[in-house]
Design a protein with these regions (language model features):
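Catalytic cores of alpha/beta
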Residues: 122-125, 304, 364-379
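Glycine-rich beta-alpha loop elements in corrinoid/cobalamin-binding modules
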Residues: 39, 46-50, 55-172, 397, ...
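Flexible glycine/acidic-rich beta-alpha junction loops that bind and position SAM and/or redox cofactors
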Residues: 13-15, 120, 267, 326, ...
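Radical SAM enzyme core and accessory elements
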Residues: 2-5, 70, 79, 150, ...
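Radical SAM [4Fe-4S] cluster-binding motif and immediate context
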Residues: 181-354, 362, 375
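Residue-level recognition of beta-strand->loop/alpha-helix junctions
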Residues: 57-60, 84, 223, 319, ...
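Short glycine-rich His-centered loop
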Residues: 3-32
């Protein structure tokens, strides 16, 4: 079968949609953010490995015009098309499918993503989509669906059909080692990257799902844990991950790997020890840099920080979310501010760079409380600052289906119609708040302009890679500051 894996291009008032591999969607002015869609890339890989003809076409991150995109898609002439969707753009995707179905009624369309995993029948009612795949392992489900449509195998679980039927609750793949390594050439790996990563960079998933010292992640704002992973966490084996890293280094000259799993693999100390041993065995330590998402409470154990540094980790992306314990409790974060501060400082003590992520605009936080978040963010940013440290700030969003969405409905927190989906992606508050959330986002981003941060970042630059990193970061910062200017 001829299958296309696509992201149709569109923008909003000149801003770029951050759709691929993104837990929180916004439109941004920053052109430096091109996140590699790992599950979509895996879907393309599995289909090709099973003998299907595959077109991978990311019109957003390739910065294609609609005409260029349509020409490439029509030249390929797919029989089946997969789109990843998300709540702020789902109406655009419904309209896209309607338009394309008029042109070619025989071409079949599949929607996957976090929103349709919660609300699969909604897309059937609002568009002529042929199939909706639910759950996070939609790469595996799509491969099985295509085989089924060709008369091979059984219907995968979690698929909704045009006739109103479905195949039941989705299932997750128990052993992620059984999946193929992503075909990087098919999926144009080289076009992706972010300002804070050294070049050439590549993305991987060491697993799927979040976990910390106190159990699986259940943050009430996190749509992926609830829509995709059933509040579970799975890891590939260390040997399997190291073999993929070796391929990326030897075949593509990759200098930095980013693990975009929700909390990386850092919550499992035994896994990290074996990972270090495998990296050493394959003679990869010192030949590639690794960065990762992480939870700060996993870094309270200084031995974990030591292992990370010795293995070649450079930067950790860590969620602070708020500088107030009451907010962390409401969010289900299962940690305290003092633990986050200690974990971040432990990492920096071992020479690891840290990106701290923050959210503002909670309905229950006052100016005093958001100022406390600002002060904690400032403290962490300026603590042992080195080239590569940074932070990011966003306005809290509560996507339909998440526990926070249900909280907002129950407490009348919404400042918009909660079903006015497009407003979830405009970098503006959707929840009532006693503070000016846009102003505070802008203020927190501008901590990068603090003279101490600038001086320490410049003085700690050691090579051309660091200089390029600083340049890209400054360029990206201007876009982010612009996002939150009224």
């Amino acid at each position: 079968m001829r299958v296309a894996i696509i992201y149709p291009p569109f923008d909003f008032e000149g801003k770029i949609p951050l759709l691929s591999q993104n837990r929180v969607f916004i439109y941004t002015h920053s052109e430096r953010i091109k996140i590699y869609p790992l599950v979509m890339a895996s879907a393309a890989t599995l289909l090709k490995a099973n003998g299907h003809d595959v077109l991978y076409l990311d019109g957003i991150n390739e910065r294609l015009s609609r005409e260029e995109f349509d020409n490439q898609l029509n030249d390929f002439s797919p029989e089946l098309v997969l789109l990843e969707t998300k709540v702020p753009v789902i109406r655009k995707h419904w309209e896209y499918i309607k338009e394309e179905k008029i042109k070619d009624p025989e071409r079949q369309y599949v929607l996957a993503g976090d929103h349709v995993s919660f609300f699969p029948t909604e897309s059937m009612e609002n568009s002529p989509v042929d199939f909706v795949i639910t759950g996070g392992d939609y790469d595996v489900s799509l491969s099985k669906l295509v085989d089924y449509l060709e008369g091979k195998g059984n219907i995968p679980k979690g698929v909704y059909f045009r006739d109103g039927s479905n195949s039941g609750k989705f299932e997750l793949t128990p052993d992620l080692d059984t999946l193929h390594y992503i075909d990087r050439e098919l999926t144009k790996w080289h076009i992706y990257g972010e300002a804070y990563l050294q070049r050439p960079c590549a993305y991987i998933l060491t697993g799927r799902g979040c976990r910390g010292p106190k159990g699986v992640g259940v943050c009430r704002f996190c749509i992926w844990q609830f829509a995709f992973w059933n509040c579970s966490a799975r890891l590939r084996s260390p040997a399997n991950v190291v073999n993929e890293i070796k391929l990326l280094v030897e075949n593509y000259g990759v200098k930095e790997i980013f693990d975009d799993n929700e909390a990386g693999s850092i919550w499992n100390k035994d896994w990290l020890i074996e990972f270090y041993q495998q990296m050493k065995k394959q003679d990869l330590i010192g030949k590639v840099i690794i960065s990762s998402n992480a939870r700060a409470d996993c870094l309270l154990d200084k031995e974990v920080c030591k292992i990370l540094k010795e293995t070649g980790f450079r930067m950790l992306k860590i969620g602070l979310e708020s500088g107030n314990d009451a907010s962390l409790r409401r969010l289900g974060k299962a940690t305290k501010v003092e633990e986050i501060v200690k974990g971040v400082k432990n990492a920096k003590d071992y020479g690891l760079r840290v990106m701290v992520t923050i959210m503002v605009g909670y309905p229950w936080e006052s100016e005093r409380e958001v100022n406390k978040t600002y002060q904690v963010a400032k403290e962490l940013l300026l603590y042992k600052t080195h080239c590569g440290d940074s932070l990011e700030a966003n306005i809290i969003s509560s996507y339909p289906g998440t526990p926070l969405f249900n909280d907002a409905l129950r407490h009348n927190w919404f400042d918009i119609d909660p079903y006015d989906y497009e407003k979830y992606g405009l970098a503006k508050p959707i929840l009532k708040s006693p503070i000016d959330a846009e102003k505070w986002c802008n203020t927190i981003w501008k901590l990068h302009l603090h003279p101490v941060f600038i001086l320490k970042s410049l003085l700690s630059a050691r090579n051309i890679h660091d200089i390029k990193l600083l340049f890209r970061g400054a360029n990206s910062l201007l876009g982010h500051i612009k996002d939150y200017i009224k």
